[in-house]
Amino acid sequence: MTTFQPGRLAGQLAATALLAATCSAFAADAPTTVPSSLGAIGTTPTLDNITMEPGLPSDAKRVYVLDPGHFHVTTTVYTIDGNKNNLLGMTDTGKLANVMLSSDGKFFVTSNTTYSRIARGKRDDYVEVIDAQSHKVLADIDIPEGRFLTGVMNRMASLSTDNKYMLFQQFAPSPAVGLVDLEKKSFVKMMDIPDCYQIFPVPNQSFYMHCRDGSLQQFGYDDKGNLKPMKPTKVFHGEDDYLFVNPYYSNGSGRLVWPTYEGRIFQAKLTDKKVDFMKPFELFTEAEKKANWRPGGWQVVAYHKARNEIYVLADQRAKWTHVTASRYVFVVDGTTGKRLRRIDLGHEIDGISVTQDANPNLYAVSAEAKTLFTFNAVTGKETGKVDELGRAPTISLTMD
């Protein structure tokens, strides 16, 4: 029951009167003209009708930078115009997200993991398809909570060569590859596989994986996720040839370039019919090996198809320091291994990528500087940068 209290009402009326008087006093003292210190900002008219301009369409110089944030629960993809070194947009992603670009550059796909209580609680895995120009979400597809959560490896998820499907790797409770139908915007099936890793798509609904014995095994699949394992290739590297976790692979050409911790370069050309292994070669001379030159970083290799040039991030370093940043890029012929040039980046770099146009950019990402540096890939000259890119960016992606 509410009791009427005249004293409380009188107090409330007095407080209201005091507040009104105070506001009137402030209004009387308010300036009637805009302070000159505000300049043009103070006289800019307000906009009643606001329109959103469309974003820039993707081109050969477009680059996407992934900031995994040192295993933070939320991550970011930065869309950057490599022509002018301008930030075009940002896409929020989940823990250890994978990013995949369509072959025509019109959309990109992210696979994500989030939790109901930020860093704990119920896990939720999903896939988003995002328009590359507007950055609008075109599809949000739920998938089983089985993404392999590890330091981001580009080939733990991939688009099919025709952009119709997305494939992602599951490690536990058993090895499998998940199939997502992007056209129907739906998850299809988890396909059981042997103990193999990394996904390298080829045409006609087929892909290869790298298996523990050092071979590549091919798998075909149909629209319902029925998997057809095929005969594995020969073992192409020895047990002591420790391969980096982020090789270069082109969905369009099937070219695979895979360096080891010591600088040996393995290569192959993958098709839906066969695999042609190329003769491996050494990146460093014997004198350079004695001086402790080794590849290092997180995304250490790139390849320019038309120029047939391999780019490897490297520095003088102690053994087993292969994930630490490097300052130099060695550029070699993709067939013979002949040294073409060495680029001093002038920064500690964690990952590199190269555009595929006639005048290519070399992109170099530094987690420490939180910056994408742009270089002329031929001359090695630094031409620009974009800084303040999150917590610890390590990976960049360009159109295939």
Swiss-Prot record:
The organism's place on the tree of life at top rank: Bacteria
Keywords, comma-separated and alphabetical: Electron transport, Oxidoreductase, Periplasm, Signal, Transport
Signal peptide extent: 1-27
Name of the gene encoding the protein in the UniProt record: mauB
InterPro entries per record: Host-pathogen_enzymatic-act, MeN_DH_Hvc, Metamine_DH_Hvc, Quino_amine_DH_bsu, WD40/YVTN_repeat-like_dom_sf
Catalysed conversion reaction: 2 oxidized [amicyanin] + methylamine + H2O = 2 reduced [amicyanin] + formaldehyde + NH4(+) + 2 H(+)
GO CC terms: periplasmic space
EC numbers: 1.4.9.1
Compartment(s): Periplasm
Protein's UniProt name: Methylamine dehydrogenase heavy chain
GO BP term (any one): methylamine metabolic process
Similarity remark: Belongs to the aromatic amine dehydrogenase heavy chain family.
GO MF term list: aliphatic amine dehydrogenase activity; methylamine dehydrogenase (amicyanin) activity
Organism ancestry: Bacteria, Pseudomonadati, Pseudomonadota, Betaproteobacteria, Nitrosomonadales
Xref: PANTHER family: DIHYDRO-HEME D1 DEHYDROGENASE, PROTEIN NIRF
Subunit-level organization: Tetramer of two light and two heavy chains.
Role this protein plays: Methylamine dehydrogenase carries out the oxidation of methylamine. Electrons are passed from methylamine dehydrogenase to amicyanin.
